[in-house]
Amino acid sequence: MGHCKVTAVCDSLASVGAFATPAGSINTQGQAGGMLRRPPSATPPSTTVPENVLPELRALEKILEQGGANLQVRVVREVRVASGASFPIYSIGIGNPSPDIPAVGFFGGVHGLERIGAEVVIAYLQNIVMRLRWDTTLHQQLEHVRLVFMPIVNPGGMWAATRANPNGVDLMRNAPVEALDRVPFLMGGQRLSAGLPWYRGHFGEPMEVESQALCEVVRTELLPRPFSIALDCHSGFGV
């Protein structure tokens, strides 16, 4: 399928109120009596996430329940934080899973401080899930495209309200490659200290678990296809 058709499908998906639910109006109120139950297709994390510490995650899990069998939900990794809680990193697939079909990936929450990026992806996912109840045109469109969502790549950083992950690593600087040309001091990535912004992690160590999760989703869901595109949502210049 060519670029034009993919663009047309994406435009159509976004046309009927794609962002009709503002990020600030996501329903983050949990079910009465406790935390939201994870969908049957998702592997539950080993430790219950404390209530009211990560409303974006609770909002996401409520949407996953509403989506039911229309969604292919997977916990790619889990991230443990200082409190002992464990947060899941979710990957959600919607539409035709055939590797011959183009795909669009939506990613958010790479930097924990930049909550708006995650909320935008969650709001769009919520819009799609709500429309699946009545929009026959959307169902027809999803026969020709695969949508992949990873709304909260860095739940530990979001829980701690930090740009970096719980290990102090900036996931946008965490890669096993070295620039050939000069990069801006510190901002281009540094290995001096996790106490400074833009820390890349120790030289020679594996990528952080969040980076591994992101790469796995891209490698399995996007790269094998004849055409794919990814949208990574950030917000502001959180340090």
Please give the residue ranges for each predicted region.
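Short, conserved beta-strand segments within well-ordered enzyme catalytic domains
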Residues: 90-92, 105, 148
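Short beta-strand element of the alpha/beta-hydrolase
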Residues: 102-108
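Active-site/substrate-binding loop(s) of hydrolase catalytic cores
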Residues: 116, 123, 127-239
